[in-house]
C-alpha cells in the first residue's frame, strides 16, 4: 500500500502535483542550462564522486562547464538566452546508471563483509 502510494506520489503522469513540480524544476534548470544530474554533489556523497571518476572525461568536462556557466549567470543575475534555453535537456541522465552500479557494488561489498573501497576520515 505504502509503496504504491509513494510511486503514485512521485509519478508526474499520474499525480498532477508531481507534474507541476517537474515542469517548474525543468524551467529553472533550463534558465541556467543545467541537467538534473548536475545537482549531485561529489563532496557530499562519495558514491557520486566514484561514479564521476568512472565516467568518460568528456562527460565530466561538459558537466563542469555547465556548472561554471550556471554560477556565472547566477552571479550576474541573468538567465540563458531564450534560444539556448530551448535547446537544453534538463532530464537527460548521464550519471544515474553509473551511480546505480557504484551503489550496487558498495552494497555487495557490505553484504560480503569487506571494507569499503573509500571512506571519509576526520583529520
Swiss-Prot record:
One of its GO terms (cellular component) is mitochondrial inner membrane. The N-terminus is blocked. Coiled coil: none annotated. Its main location: mitochondrion. It is found in: Mitochondrion inner membrane. It is a peripheral membrane protein. The keyword Mitochondrion applies. Keywords: Electron transport, Membrane, Mitochondrion, Mitochondrion inner membrane, Respiratory chain, Transport. GO terms for biological process: mitochondrial electron transport, ubiquinol to cytochrome c. Disulfide bonds: none annotated. Component of the ubiquinol-cytochrome c oxidoreductase (cytochrome b-c1 complex, complex III, CIII), a multisubunit enzyme composed of 3 respiratory subunits cytochrome b, cytochrome c1 and Rieske protein, 2 core protein subunits, and additional low-molecular weight protein subunits. The complex exists as an obligatory dimer and forms supercomplexes (SCs) in the inner mitochondrial membrane with cytochrome c oxidase (complex IV, CIV). Belongs to the UQCRB/QCR7 family. Component of the ubiquinol-cytochrome c oxidoreductase, a multisubunit transmembrane complex that is part of the mitochondrial electron transport chain which drives oxidative phosphorylation. This is Cytochrome b-c1 complex subunit 7. It comes from Solanum tuberosum.
